């Protein structure tokens, strides 16, 4: 099996998850930041990781997701919102809509620590984003437990 891991990371959170995915995979595998990533053609399984901007995948990842065609995908994301929150679920749903035709075999998301600059910007808005209230709980995430949960989920799917 040939696997591709593609990720976008502003603060390093999604990169940590991407590296955990990469460690889990057997067979032939490659890992790239989204800016350098090849297309999904020729890979048996593509893992795409992204951070959220305005409740959706970041722009670079959104563009990549729109180009994957009918590839087999596993989506993963980091965000300031609580894991399992409506914000997180809606963001993953938005990612799925970008991948029309793809076979999405799984998804995972967890909190990721929000960088101070982003927190400051969010607090200054006249209508603060919904995830801001959850941001204090995101400190230190993704942690070893988050990465282990992602790796278990991938192993349980028996994809690789």
Locate the predicted segments by residue.
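Structured loop/turn residues at beta-strand edges in well-structured enzyme cores
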Residues: 1, 41, 102
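FMN-binding flavodoxin-like domain, especially the glycine-rich phosphate-binding loop
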Residues: 23-30, 45-48, 53-160
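N-terminal beta1-alpha1 ligand-phosphate binding loop
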Residues: 2-24
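Generic structural signal for beta-strand residues in well-ordered domains
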Residues: 7, 38-40, 66, 97
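Short acidic low-complexity segments
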Residues: 30-42
């Amino acid at each position: 099996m040939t696997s591709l891991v593609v990720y976008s990371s502003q603060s390093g959170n999604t990169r940590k998850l991407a590296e955990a995915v990469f460690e889990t995979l057997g067979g032939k595998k490659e890992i790239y930041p989204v800016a350098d990533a090849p297309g999904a053609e020729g890979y048996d399984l593509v893992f795409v990781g992204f951070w959220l901007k305005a409740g959706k995948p970041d722009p670079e990842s959104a563009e990549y997701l729109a180009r994957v065609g009918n590839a087999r995908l596993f989506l993963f994301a980091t965000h300031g919102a609580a894991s399992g929150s409506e914000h997180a679920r809606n963001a993953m749903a938005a990612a799925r809509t970008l991948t029309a035709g793809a076979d999405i075999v799984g998804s995972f998301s967890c909190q990721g620590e929000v960088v101070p600059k982003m927190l400051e910007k969010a607090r200054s808005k006249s209508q603060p984003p919904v995830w801001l209230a959850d941001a204090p709980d995101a400190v230190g995430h993704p942690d070893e437990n988050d990465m282990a949960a992602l790796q278990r989920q991938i192993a349980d799917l028996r994809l690789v």
